[in-house]
């Protein structure tokens, strides 16, 4: 590495400098409060850092950000490093791979990359990442006037929802509370419960329910008409948007919005439901 350029970890005290660097050079659309909300989540006890950065004469010239989480799996506790924004100014692009090497040099983590741009797909493969290809689909929210019935109970307040969730799902719910743009709802039948974590966004001018997580994909499929009708009448959204990998079956009348979305991981994913979009930048930044 050039003596002029230094590589070091991004600590909490650096987050604002990194934010302004990315806001100026990469994505001006992210708000500072959302940025802080993402990196100040208590998803891991004593996270090591927030990623790595390149500096020259105290100025940030490149970053590779990361969100860390500690997940309960069938095999026990799994430490996950979810890499997010990887951006280096053109003049310093020769140092980009040093950021990736530093990130992967951390021991004891499963590494995921869920918003990789196509121009760095091959670089991820060269660093030993495995790939998973999915599709983004849209489900029309069709009206069903009797969606609220004895068959399907709808719970939205935290006190009511939490008592019907098992310990694992309840922790996921807790970890994603108090995020300004994110909503949660629980659908319940006599013998099943479904937690949905989602946000509302405008896609191509159309108001849409965007689902990050389903705790019970089979239940979602079986009750899709009632659930999507609820989104239509209560959230005033015309479509529900979800990745194919998050559902068990493709609903009738759904259509593809985007194909060949490639997600990456490196490490042992056995026991972890990969891919999932919780505990990641999708919750905060990806639009």
Roles of regions detected by a PLM:
Residues 4-18:
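A short beta-loop-alpha structural element at the N-terminal edge
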Residues 59-62:
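Glycine-rich acetyl-CoA-binding "A-motif" of GNAT/NAT acetyltransferases
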Residues 258-287:
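C-terminal functional modules
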Residues 18, 22, 26-51, 55, ...:
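Amide-forming acyltransferase catalytic core, primarily the GNAT-like/NAT-type
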């Amino acid at each position: 590495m050039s003596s002029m350029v230094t590589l070091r970890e991004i600590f909490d005290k650096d987050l604002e400098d990194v934010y302004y660097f990315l806001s100026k050079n990469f994505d001006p659309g992210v708000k500072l409060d959302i940025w802080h909300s993402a990196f100040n989540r208590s998803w891991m006890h004593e996270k090591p850092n927030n990623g790595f950065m390149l500096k020259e004469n105290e100025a940030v010239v490149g970053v590779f950000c990361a969100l860390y989480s500690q997940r309960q799996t069938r095999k026990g506790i799994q430490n996950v490093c979810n890499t997010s924004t990887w951006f280096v100014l053109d003049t310093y692009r020769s140092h980009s791979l040093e950021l990736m090497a530093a990130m992967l040099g951390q021991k004891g983590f499963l590494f995921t990359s869920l918003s990789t741009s196509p121009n760095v797909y091959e670089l991820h493969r060269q660093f030993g990442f495995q790939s998973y290809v999915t599709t983004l689909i849209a489900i029309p929210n069709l009206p069903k006037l009797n969606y609220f019935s004895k068959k399907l109970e709808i719970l939205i307040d935290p006190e009511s929802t939490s008592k019907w969730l098992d310990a694992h799902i309840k922790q996921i719910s807790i970890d994603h509370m108090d995020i300004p743009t994110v909503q949660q709802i629980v659908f319940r039948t006599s013998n099943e419960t479904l937690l949905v974590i989602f946000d509302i966004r405008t896609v191509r001018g159309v108001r849409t329910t965007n689902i990050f997580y389903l705790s019970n994909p089979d239940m979602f499929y079986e009750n899709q008409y009632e659930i999507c009708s609820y989104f239509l009448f209560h959230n005033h959204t015309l479509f529900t948007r979800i990745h194919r990998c998050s559902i068990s079956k493709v609903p009738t009348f759904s259509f593809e919005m985007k194909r060949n979305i490639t997600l990456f991981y490196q490490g042992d994913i056995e026991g972890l439901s990969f891919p999932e979009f919780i505990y990641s930048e999708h919750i905060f930044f990806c639009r």
